Amino acid sequence: MKKQKVFIIAGPTASGKSGLALSLAEKIGGEIVNADAFQVYKGLQILTARPTPEEMHGIPHHLYGYADNDAQEDVAGWVQKAANVIPEIKNPIVVGGTGLYLSVLMNGLSPIPDVSPEIRKEVRLMDPKEVVAKLEKGTVPRDIQRQRRALEILLETGQPIEYFQNLPKKNYIDADFYPVVLLPPREKLYARIEKRLIQMLEQNVVEEVQKLLVSSASGGVMKAIGVRELIDFIEKRCDLQTAAEKILLSTRHYAKRQMTWFRHQMPSAKILKTPEVTDVITL
């Protein structure tokens, strides 16, 4: 039986992925599946550049805005949902800038056990130094989020996280993937990032973040670039220009990391400098 063909459109923030995915969907009668870790949340449509109903142009879009703002959605939760949705679509187009999500979809995920809510809460409340001190087995990850994850697994199972990472990966979907990575020249990408930020400010992104703050949201959505900076402005710790400059700098750094990741982690992908739909259709 012939495998399902799945287009993957990846790239850094503001590179034109969504527009390319939309053009491709219109050409082939496709449907779009989100692979952006922050666009899965219901909040912050403006700040995360989640497509509006008008911007969807009548094309079916999946896995956008499904998670509550208090939720902590992760790659395991997302890939399971994607694996349920994609086989039901005739011409699926997966689009996003979260490299880990795309990698797991194409290559599978290590069978890491679930962690109880009690242990998750216990580790979340620990001081970072305490977390590192308790990671006696195995290597210690560099950032605190991965350190906490490693400790959760250690406390839950008695085994270091590397034990599970070295087990055979679980594949969620049997398909032929056709990956494309949009990598515009850096100057053009930075100009697009700045233009998008100006548009967000004009669209009242400050009010959007303020509503989220009032709702006491505590989920993964709060980690989106721009949330902390705009909260500093809302709570009068800086002016709007300073907040905007910080958002711009953080977004540029993030885009640079994304570009590096895609170059090294998706070597089989076709690299595009401009979002030309004909270059994708010919794959």
Question: Which positions does each model-derived feature cover?
Answer:
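Phosphate/pyrophosphate-binding catalytic cores of soluble transferases and nucleic-acid-acting enzymes
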Residues: 1-283
